[in-house]
Each structure stands twice: as structure tokens, then as C-alpha cells.
């Protein structure tokens, strides 16, 4: 068997079947789909069983609710293929879109294969924007090649997720690379960082294959950030992973600054004051922050502008779709 597709499933009864069907027609052959039900309580578990019963290439595993990282790790343990691909339960791929990926994997046999993706933005259930992101280069890369162009790969989001990559399972198991189950933000990126030092050959495809559905609930990432008591301490595994790769410390600082900014985006004024005070006592205190009041006011202004931009883009997109004879885009 060549491919094991791992789909962690938690309360996704409305989207899972569409995701599974898109994989079944994406052009893969000699593959399995592993549905890891992570203690769902909305009918997802029963849907997993039905899909498994109807399709011989689908297997289903049930476990108590432990989180997406534990579900992915269970998938690694259960997988039978040469390559593993992690897919989220509300995302899709286009028909026949992975045929070229299949051919490349069979011919080149890289340790890791990465490809492009699109971010699909929705408003009231309808897509109003698709943003394609592709790796900066095409072809086989050595680890040193990737390190030399690390910023370019990072800035186009080619490195941070796992769902735009195929991984050799024997490499994961040989080096014991797992998802950190005590982390709930950017655990994908840490997984990639910890595996990269063992990848001798990496193949890059400049084609947007994976369709990532951006959550309409913009506060979901913020709620996960709220669970981090000390952001500087949370950064330590990323710092170690980047240090092992030989990536300059400025990258860690930029990552920290980005997460701190996101953490303060929806925060109250008192929360921002507390976060800035904690920052000023911490490891990254040399990265100067504006006055808490300025942060608070700027965040509110940006949120207002964002809501207006979404409303304008949505109405323009829907009007254009109607003019072309379509009521919506999915």
C-alpha cells in the first residue's frame, strides 16, 4: 500500500462525507483512508462507521476525546502505507488533483513531498475569496536547499501545516516523530521542524492542491492562544527545533511577535496590560511593544476595517457570481 490518509474526526458530521468523497476521486491509487473518531458526540462516530461499511478502502478507529494531536498519532500507529497524509475533516481536494503527486511520489520517492494550497474564506456559508499559496520552487531539494530558502518557504505557508505534505512513514517511525499532545497551537509546525533534520530529499510541487476552509469563527485561534499561560515558555520547543536546523534566532522572535499580536487582537484592555507586563519581564523583552492603550485601540480599528472588507468582498463576489449565472461557490 502506498498512501495512508489520516483524518482526525471530532464533531464533524456536516463536513466529513464531503471531505472523504473528495479524497476518493482525487486520483490516488493503492491507498487507505483512516478515520480517527476522537470521541465525537454529534453523530460523527456513526457516520464514520457507515462510511467504513460502504467503502473497503476506509478504516475507522474510535477513541475517547484526546485532541487532534492524539488522533493523528493514533493514525501514525495504525497506518499501513509507505506515505502518510494528514487531512482535516472540513477540507477538500479537487478531482484528479493528486494524480501528479502520486506519480511524483512513485518516481522520486522523496522523504517529504510538499505542494501548494488555497485558503478559502467563507461568510455565512458562502465562499467569497480563494487565496492560492504555492512553494517558491519546483523540484527535488536537499535539506540545505530548503534551509537556504527557509524564509521564502515559511512566508508562503509551505512549512507550517501538515496537510500540504506527504511524509514517509518509515522515517516517522524510525525517529519517533510524533505530534506533541500537550500543545494546542502550531503543533503542525513543530512536527515538521522536528522531522526535517532527517529528510535528505524533499520534493516541492508548485500547484495549489489542498483546499483549506478558513473557519468563519475568527476567534477560534484566539481561544487556543488564551490557554497559553506563558507565550515565551511555549516557544521553547520551536526555538530548539529551529536551532537544530541552524535557522537564525530572528525567526523565533518573529514567530513569538506574531503570536503575541494575535493573542492581543481580541483581548480586553486589562488583558493587554497584563500580557505586555508579562512580555516586559520575559525572554523576549527586547522586542519593544507599544503602549497597551495603543494596542487596544489599533486592534479595535483593524477589526472594524476587517468586517467592512469582508462585507464588501462578499457582496461583490456574490453579485459577480449571480451575473455569471451562479448562486454560490463551494
Where would I find each of the regions flagged by the language model?
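Acidic helix N-cap motif at the loop->helix transition within catalytic regions
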Residues: 14-17, 42-50, 92, 96
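Short, acidic, metal-binding catalytic loop of nucleotide-sugar glycosyltransferases
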Residues: 21-30
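A conserved acidic beta->alpha catalytic loop
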Residues: 22, 37-46, 64
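Glycine-rich, basic loop-to-helix element that forms the pyrophosphate-binding segment
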Residues: 63-79
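Donor-binding/catalytic cores of nucleotide-activated saccharide
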Residues: 68, 89-202, 210-226
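Short aromatic/hydrophobic "clamp" motif used to bind/position activated sugar donors
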Residues: 84
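Catalytic core of nucleotide-sugar-dependent glycosyltransferases
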Residues: 207-216, 221-253, 262-284
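Membrane-interface aromatic/basic loop that binds lipid-linked glycans or pyrophosphate carriers
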Residues: 240, 268-330
Amino acid at each position: 500500500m502506498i498512501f495512508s490518509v489520516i483524518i482526525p474526526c471530532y464533531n464533524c458530521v456536516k463536513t466529513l462525507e464531503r471531505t472523504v468523497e473528495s479524497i476518493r476521486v482525487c486520483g490516488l491509487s493503492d491507498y487507505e483512508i483512516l478515520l480517527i473518531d476522537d470521541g465525537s458526540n454529534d453523530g460523527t462516530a456513526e457516520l464514520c462507521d457507515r462510511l467504513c461499511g460502504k467503502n473497503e478502502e476506509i478504516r475507522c478507529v474510535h477513541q475517547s476525546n484526546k485532541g487532534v494531536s492524539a488522533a493523528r498519532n493514533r493514525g501514525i500507529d495504525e497506518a499501513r502505507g509507505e506515505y502518510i497524509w494528514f487531512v482535516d475533516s472540513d477540507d477538500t481536494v479537487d478531482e484528479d488533483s493528486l494524480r501528479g503527486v502520486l506519480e511524483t511520489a512513485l518516481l522520486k520517492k522523496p522523504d517529504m513531498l510538499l505542494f501548494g494550497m488555497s485558503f478559502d474564506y467563507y461568510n455565512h456559508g458562502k465562499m467569497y475569496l480563494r487565496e492560492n499559496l504555492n512553494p517558491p520552487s519546483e523540484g527535488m531539494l536537499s535539506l540545505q536547499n530548503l534551509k537556504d530558502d527557509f524564509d521564502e518557504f515559511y512566508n508562503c505557508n509551505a512549512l507550517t501545516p501538515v496537510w500540504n505534505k506527504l511524509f514517509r512513514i518509515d522515517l516517522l517511525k524510525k525517529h519517533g516523530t510524533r505530534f506533541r499532545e500537550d500543545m494546542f497551537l502550531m503543533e503542525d509546525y513543530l512536527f515538521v521542524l522536528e522531522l526535517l533534520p532527517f529528510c535528505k530529499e524533499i520534493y516541492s510541487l508548485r500547484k495549489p492542491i489542498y483546499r483549506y476552509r478558513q473557519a468563519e469563527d475568527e476567534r477560534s485561534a484566539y481561544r487556543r492562544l488564551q490557554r497559553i499561560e506563558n507565550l515565551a515558555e511555549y516557544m521553547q520547543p520551536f526555538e530548539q527545533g529551529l536551532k537544530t536546523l541552524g535557522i537564525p534566532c530572528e525567526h523565533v522572535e518573529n514567530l513569538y511577535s506574531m503570536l503575541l499580536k494575535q493573542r492581543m487582537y481580541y483581548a480586553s484592555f486589562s488583558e493587554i496590560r497584563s500580557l505586555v507586563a508579562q512580555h516586559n519581564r520575559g525572554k523576549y523583552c527586547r522586542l519593544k511593544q507599544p503602549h497597551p492603550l495603543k494596542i487596544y485601540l489599533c486592534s479595535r480599528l483593524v477589526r472594524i476595517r476587517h468586517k467592512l472588507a469582508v462585507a464588501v468582498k462578499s457582496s461583490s463576489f456574490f453579485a459577480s457570481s449571480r451575473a455569471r449565472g451562479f448562486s454560490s461557490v463551494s
